[in-house]
């Protein structure tokens, strides 16, 4: 029996966050087929009347590809240079792919100091609302080329999972779909344990969940799940919802919006 997540059926304004692992192949090359498929699916949603915002990672990964480098440099200035180079190429790829489906896109690069304060926060909020009204799909990334935290001036979001949640909060999104390298949240690492079970729904971010998703000594042990729980917590505090799912199956986004039980659904109890 196919179950339906009925509350998702009401979603009209949707934020999709895609991570570097879904954009860059294991050999360091750009995953062109994934970007093309993403452009098709989001353009199709826009044609159907949904308001869509894309939060993307990948600037440094694409920068490495552009320069033919296979190792991320340790120096902050070198990483910023790569982000600057990669962001141009990344947006060029997105523009080309979306153009195939007659969809216009825009770019917005954010830093934490802009979204943390009510006065400055109004600017990206107003810009995003205006872009959506123009039938544009905004593409958002952190401004990695300039974002560096100092003692009294925080400019970095920390990761783009958090950025996806903050953007969802900013635009009062009905749903955040987070594309990852895993099918959802499991009770233990499914790449190691054959009996790992996926959580269909999560209603609260507990200390037990955080410990399970935490560092190298945890049962889970895969990087990035802690940041996804932190993003979910931001959404819970705003009475918003998120689905965590696999970025290798981008076409499932449509089924998720239709309420199909795919991935892990984070929402407060109805």
Curated annotation (Swiss-Prot):
- Where on this chain does substrate bind? 57, 144, 160
Q: Does the keyword Ligase apply?
A: no
For this UniProt record, the keywords arranged alphabetically read as follows: Amino-acid biosynthesis, ATP-binding, Cytoplasm, Kinase, Nucleotide-binding, Proline biosynthesis, Transferase
Q: Which GO terms describe its biological process?
A: L-proline biosynthetic process
Listed binding positions for ATP are 17, 180-181, 222-228
Enzyme class name: transferase
Q: Which reaction does it catalyse?
A: L-glutamate + ATP = L-glutamyl 5-phosphate + ADP
GO cellular-component terms in the record? cytosol
MF terms from GO for this chain are:
ATP binding; glutamate 5-kinase activity
**Pathway it works in:** Amino-acid biosynthesis; L-proline biosynthesis; L-glutamate 5-semialdehyde from L-glutamate: step 1/2
Q: Does the keyword Transcription apply?
A: no
Can you say where in the cell this protein is located?
Cytoplasm
Q: Which family does it belong to?
A: Belongs to the glutamate 5-kinase family.
Q: Which PANTHER family match?
A: GLUTAMATE 5-KINASE (PTHR43654), ISOPENTENYL PHOSPHATE KINASE (PTHR43654:SF1)
Q: Function of this protein?
A: Catalyzes the transfer of a phosphate group to glutamate to form L-glutamate 5-phosphate.
Name-wise, this protein is: Glutamate 5-kinase
Query: Where does this protein come from, organism-wise?
Result: Lactococcus lactis subsp. cremoris (strain SK11)
Lineage per the UniProt record: Bacteria, Bacillati, Bacillota, Bacilli, Lactobacillales
Which gene name belongs to this protein?
A: proB
């Amino acid at each position: 029996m196919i179950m339906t997540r009925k509350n998702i059926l009401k979603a009209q304004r949707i934020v999709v966050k895609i991570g570097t692992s879904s954009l860059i192949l294991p050999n360091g090359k750009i995953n062109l087929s994934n970007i093309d498929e993403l452009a098709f699916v989001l353009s199709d949603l826009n044609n159907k009347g949904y308001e869509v915002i894309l939060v993307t990672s990948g600037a440094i990964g694409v920068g490495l590809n552009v320069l033919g480098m296979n190792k991320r440099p340790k120096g902050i200035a070198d990483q910023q240079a790569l982000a600057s180079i990669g962001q141009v190429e990344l947006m060029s790829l997105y523009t080309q792919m979306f153009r195939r489906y007659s969809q216009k896109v825009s770019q917005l690069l954010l830093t934490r100091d802009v979204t943390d304060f009510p006065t400055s926060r109004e600017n990206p909020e107003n810009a995003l609302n205006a872009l959506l009204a123009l039938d544009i799909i905004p593409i958002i990334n952190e401004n990695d080329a300039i974002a560096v935290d100092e003692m009294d001036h925080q400019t970095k979001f920390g990761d783009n999972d958090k950025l996806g949640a903050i953007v969802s909060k900013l635009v009062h999104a009905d749903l955040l779909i987070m594309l990852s390298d895993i099918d959802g949240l499991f009770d233990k690492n499914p790449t190691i344990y054959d009996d790992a079970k996926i959580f269909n729904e999560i209603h609260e971010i507990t200390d037990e969940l955080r410990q399970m998703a935490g560092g190298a000594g945890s049962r889970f042990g895969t990087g990035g799940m802690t940041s996804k729980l932190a993003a979910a917590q931001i959404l819970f505090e705003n009475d918003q919802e998120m689905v965590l799912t696999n970025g290798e199956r981008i076409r499932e986004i449509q089924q998720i919006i239709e309420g199909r039980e795919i991935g892990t659904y984070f929402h407060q109890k109805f």
